[in-house]
Amino acid sequence: MSNKKTFKKYSRVAGLLTVALIIGNLVTANAESNKQNTASTETTTTNEQPKPESSELTIEKAGQKMDDMLNSNDMIKLAPKEMPLESAEKEEKKSEDKKKSEEDHTEEINDKIYSLNYNELEVLAKNGETIENFVPKEGVKKADKFIVIERKKKNINTTPVDISIIDSVTDRTYPAALQLANKGFTENKPDAVVTKRNPQKIHIDLPGMGDKATVEVNDPTYANVSTAIDNLVNQWHDNYSGGNTLPARTQYTESMVYSKSQIEAALNVNSKILDGTLGIDFKSISKGEKKVMIAAYKQIFYTVSANLPNNPADVFDKSVTFKDLQRKGVSNEAPPLFVSNVAYGRTVFVKLETSSKSNDVEAAFSAALKGTDVKTNGKYSDILENSSFTAVVLGGDAAEHNKVVTKDFDVIRNVIKDNATFSRKNPAYPISYTSVFLKNNKIAGVNNRTEYVETTSTEYTSGKINLSHQGAYVAQYEILWDEINYDDKGKEVITKRRWDNNWYSKTSPFSTVIPLGANSRNIRIMARECTGLAWEWWRKVIDERDVKLSKEINVNISGSTLSPYGSITYK
């Protein structure tokens, strides 16, 4: 109770002090007013008794009121002036932001990124297909043909360091861009790390520019870096090109196509891009109905490089914290990457496709791509005459040769040669890039591992054996062969076949035709003649155990009993 009275007393005192302050202000104001009227007052009141001033009356009344309030039990309520809460929070946040921007987190960034624990090969591992079940061999009969489709399980493991650029990722694959080393990166869909950055120097390797080839970009965003590169290129055209064109540096790779994951690993390009532009029929390839080769020509006009940082924090504004980077996805499982260089030029993809079942298809395609004159090679020439070719150009003056489909490979050669020089009319296009780990500047190579089924098809044509006996003796034949088929598990099924007239005696002249199916193998031809000699009644004239299947196998025997002659020729 005493505490309550004490509190009331002090509340009254506080209230009275406030009132006193207000009265003091009023008194001061009255005093000023009285001063101004002093002269007139003195003139009119010289013979009158002085009256108390109004300010004195006010003070007297206020003092009496204060005494009454001190002796009262009533609470004095003060209404404090309220500040808007929203305004206060804004001021507080503004203050915090300013403080944060002035803080230097360089050491923290370096320590945290250097302490990230990861395996470069594992975080960028791309595991493609795993092959478990497949039919190793399959036989298909078509009219007088027998097609053997053979499948073999293969592995491919590549670690390319230059990654193909597609339109959808150019805004996150520019020089000095920051990325995450995660699954998206391995699939050519990198995740960008966007945050406040320090200025960044970039360099273009166009000849003759000297120191002018290096510029500093204050805020290295995609837009700012692209503008800086455009300015450098225009500067080269205006001042250093001498009106001359710049020949491209060409990189060339080729591979037969067996599966999507295999061609991605072999050429380091997204199979969706190839499929969308070239129209690869993977289904027909897996069935052995088509054979396809893809060649990729990278024609590089120039490369733009970003200066590598000495320490990870060099690329960030000092206000950036490691928590900021964590919110962007940086972790042990997804360490940060830095795009160190980008190659600009154009890419030409060429598809060579045939339905030929020849085992020389790959060799014929390679010879054509390398510019070898295949017309002198009958086998290669036949394959190319029954092939189609498609070329797609990305970059440069692509409008001229956007997509070309032809039966004449010379047209494809012209597409590759045309516009292979850099000029204003034939501009460069970002075609590939290389990234490094921000922690140590090690090159980030995608570790492609995939299994695939290599499908080859061999076509066999039915044939026949032409027997001709012109010898002066009695002859006998033994004709044997196997017919090959495959069950639904790909296991070879062999059926033994023989000529119905084996071991029957034949006198000259004699001739007949024995038809052979397209699936005939292991052909054996034996012919013998009767000598009439007691110690050698039968003598072999022909005994061939590995006769190859041909359209016509001509077996001729002639001569006498003591001097027989035999031959096998093919047609």
Curated annotation (Swiss-Prot):
Q: Where is this region: Disordered?
A: 32-56, 81-108
- Coiled coil stretches, renumbered: none
Q: Where is the signal peptide?
A: 1-33
Q: Position of motif Cholesterol binding?
A: 561
PROSITE patterns from the UniProt entry: THIOL_CYTOLYSINS
Molecular function GO terms recorded: cholesterol binding; toxin activity
The record's subcellular locations are: Secreted; Host cell membrane
Indicate what this protein is called per its UniProt record: Streptolysin O
Q: Which gene encodes it?
A: slo
